Amino acid sequence: MVKFPALTHYWPLIRFLVPLGITNIAIDFGEQALNRGIAAVKEDAVEMLASYGLAYSLMKFFAGPMSDFKNVGLVFVNSKRDRAKAVLCMVVAGAIAAVFHTLIAYSDLGYYIINKLHHVDESVGSKTRRAFLYLAAFPFMDAMAWTHAGILLKHKYSFLVGCASISDVIAQVVFVAILLHSHLECREPLLIPILSLYMGALVRCTTLCLGYYRNIHDIIPDRSGPELGGDATIRKMLSFWWPLALILATQRISRPIVNLFVSRDLGGSSAATEAVAILTATYPVGHMPYGWLTEIRAVYPAFDKNNPSNKLANTNNTVTSAHIKKFTFVCMALSLTLCFVMFWTPNVSEKILIDIIGVDFAFAELCVIPLRIFSFFPVPVTVRAHLTGWLMTLKKTFVLAPSSVLRIIVLITSLVVLPYLGVHGATLGVGSLLAGFVGESTMVALAACYVYRKQKKKMENESATEGEDSAMTDMPPAEEVTDIVEMREENE
């Protein structure tokens, strides 16, 4: 067997990240396959797709940030007691989400948000609210799965996490195919995608929970000792989580904002419809070569030796901070190479769109320029992911909150200003998204510099204090000095 000594320190990082990257790409493919399966319903297919899509997007926007509790499990859960606190947080959050779903389904608030704000007719609106009610339990299942995924990632079981997510996608596709041949197609077609979604989540949650109990539950202590940083409090967990949740919420709302401004810029004409369609087609394709880079933020908390919570999980860890930085740079270079090969090589991007999305060649040609803009996304995404992971290790996520605000400000500013420079349509949308990413990454970099300077100053002060203490310790006690003087006088 051929060995590469130079890669010895990088194999753990590769084994950790590859399953997560494959999972990220598989989810993109899975959503496309699920939508194609839903569209196979014979009656009211378009209306059902619209109702389910609207309900699903609302559910992901309001409850999606709970998926960032994966990072709470990754950073904070060092004992059975810590896990119990994390699970309690998710039970409460799931209950709040269920109440919110019920209010949207039955109150005037739901009618305003769905019917009025989205300008849909009564039939689509009622089906959307019903679908939203059916999805009430999904955020809880999703959050429970992600919490245990974070705990498994801390102990380097990324392959198991990847298998669970891929099993989720496979279960969704399989159950759509099964339910399409059942009586649900006639009685309640909305339940076909929703039940498939629940079955996929059940498979993922069960896999992750069983993986936790089999591999981790018996090896972690009942309580965290001082060497592991002590027991985490619910307040610390929530303080760590909310900036990450805010960032995810702004990411989820960015695309609807882009669609709205692009459509309004073209006056709601057929060109506007075409531009939004191009954005819809190009986003999953453009996202594939760089989307997996966001998983890099889990590397620092999982491998950094300076993180006290890794002492239990990383008994044989040979990975240093320098290795993580080099590995991150190589990942960025690989993603950039993929982007330029896929989107700048003649006819390659068109073929991908025709084969995967199913568009015609004329439409695919219109997507070329937006896809080429996606080629530059890996740089800001890598910077953001790497520095976010470092800040997560230090539990300083609160400094990330301004980056989400700046992203929205830069995004909207670009959408308003660029049309005056002659940029319109899908190019306007993707260009503004890139500007938002750059703005967000810049703010994250500034926040990281601020934290780094504070950490450096703190270490210098501690070193100075230790130096003074050691100097005081080296001086002999006053009684010993007196005895020495008396002995000299006697000798004289």
From Swiss-Prot:
Membrane topology field: Multi-pass membrane protein
Catalytic reaction(s) noted: ATP(in) = ATP(out); citrate(in) = citrate(out)
Molecular function GO terms recorded: ATP transmembrane transporter activity; inorganic diphosphate transmembrane transporter activity; phosphate transmembrane transporter activity
Keywords, ordered alphabetically: Cell membrane, Membrane, Transmembrane, Transmembrane helix, Transport
Cellular component GO terms held in the UniProt record: extracellular region; membrane; plasma membrane
Extracellular topological segments: 107-131, 180-189, 348-350, 427-429
Residues in compartment: Cytoplasmic: 1-85, 153-158, 211-326, 372-403, 453-492
Swiss-Prot/TrEMBL GO biological process terms: ATP export; bone mineralization; calcium ion homeostasis; cementum mineralization; diphosphate metabolic process; gene expression; inhibition of non-skeletal tissue mineralization; inorganic diphosphate transport
Localization terms from the record: Cell membrane
Ranges for region Disordered: 458-492
Spans traversing the lipid bilayer: 86-106, 132-152, 159-179, 190-210, 327-347, 351-371, 404-426, 430-452
Major subcellular site: membrane
Function, in words: Transports adenosine triphosphate (ATP) and possibly other nucleoside triphosphates (NTPs) from cytosol to the extracellular space. Mainly regulates their levels locally in peripheral tissues while playing a minor systemic role. Prevents abnormal ectopic mineralization of the joints by regulating the extracellular levels of the calcification inhibitor inorganic pyrophosphate (PPi), which originates from the conversion of extracellular NTPs to NMPs and PPis by ENPP1. Regulates the release of the TCA cycle intermediates to the extracellular space, in particular citrate, succinate and malate.
Matches recorded under PANTHER family: PROGRESSIVE ANKYLOSIS PROTEIN HOMOLOG
Family to which this protein belongs: Belongs to the ANKH family.
Name of the protein described by the UniProt record: Mineralization regulator ANKH
Gene this chain is encoded by: Ankh
